[in-house]
Every structure is written in structure tokens, then in C-alpha cells.
A protein has these predicted regions:
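Acidic donor-binding segment of Leloir-type glycosyltransferases
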Residues: 1-10, 19
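Catalytic-site signature of metal-activated, phosphate-bearing donor transferases
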Residues: 11-21, 28, 39-150
């Protein structure tokens, strides 16, 4: 039986994520944002990656960002790099997988990072081992404006 829990968001992303992880019961936590899509190959390889590296506590997962409608003006304004595939800031590593240990916690109100671990490693930056993170320019601008209010 699954129990769904709702939490009021207080404008502090790390506090919110830390509250949610208290309900996790597995050996590892794989936390992705609502707008991120893991590649099926990544999902298939996770047991092998985790099993082959039992001493590693945290994994950084590469993320493919795409922004429909982005212009050279946006790229320059935000200091982004866009490759020939249209991927923004690739591999844009994200803290997404970690051992479920009470000392590993999120910090920072916005653009959160994990703390309380000793070992970490990046997952190789290939398309098949990445998260896909599609956006529109309208959504990106609204998100930037919202983050500026926090």
C-alpha cells in the first residue's frame, strides 16, 4: 500500500526535499525533478552501476537540457553553452542518486546540492545514461523570474 503525502512548499527547495526523503526506505534514493525524464538505458544500468561501486555514496547524473525557442540573445544573457545537438550546458551534472543515509542532506534554498557524504562519482556523460530535461523559452523565463523572488 502506498501512502501519498502532500507538503506545503515554503520557498526553500532543500528543506522541502529533505522532508520528502524522510519517507524513503530503500538503500538508495533516486530523486528527479518533475520535468526530468530518465533514459531507459540509464534505468536499466542503475543496478549494475550501484552494485559495482558499493563504497560510493553519491552519483552525479548527466542531464540533457533543451529549450525550445532559445535565441542567441538568451544564450549570451545567461552565459549558456549550446552544443551542435542543441543541448544546453551538457553534461550539466545533477545530484540525483545517493545512499539513503541520514547524514546526507540537501542544502541551499535554490539550486540545491547534497552535503554530508565522503565519496561521489559522475555517471558517464552519454545520451543513454542521461536525464532529458525539455523546456520552452517561456517556461525558462518564468522559472528564472520565480527563482529571483526566493
Amino acid at each position: 500500500v502506498q501512502t501519498w503525502r502532500g507538503f506545503d512548499f515554503n520557498g526553500h527547495f532543500a528543506d522541502w526535499k529533505n522532508q520528502l526523503t524522510e519517507y524513503c526506505s530503500g538503500d538508495y534514493i533516486f530523486q528527479i525533478d518533475a520535468d526530468e525524464i530518465p533514459h531507459q538505458v540509464l534505468l536499466g544500468y542503475l543496478p549494475e552501476i550501484l552494485g559495482n561501486n558499493p563504497d560510493n555514496e553519491v552519483y552525479l547524473v548527466p542531464r540533457i537540457n533543451t529549450v525550445e525557442g532559445i535565441t542567441d540573445e538568451h544564450i549570451k544573457k545567461w552565459g549558456w553553452n549550446v552544443n551542435d545537438k542543441g543541448w544546453v550546458n551538457y553534461p550539466d551534472y545533477q545530484w540525483r542518486i545517493w545512499k539513503n543515509k541520514p547524514e546526507i542532506k540537501w542544502k541551499n534554498k535554490v539550486h540545491e546540492v547534497l552535503e554530508g557524504f565522503k565519496t561521489y562519482a559522475p555517471i558517464p556523460s552519454t545520451e543513454q545514461l542521461s536525464l532529458y530535461h525539455p523546456k520552452t523559452i517561456d517556461r525558462q523565463e518564468k522559472q528564472n523570474a520565480y527563482y529571483n523572488t526566493l
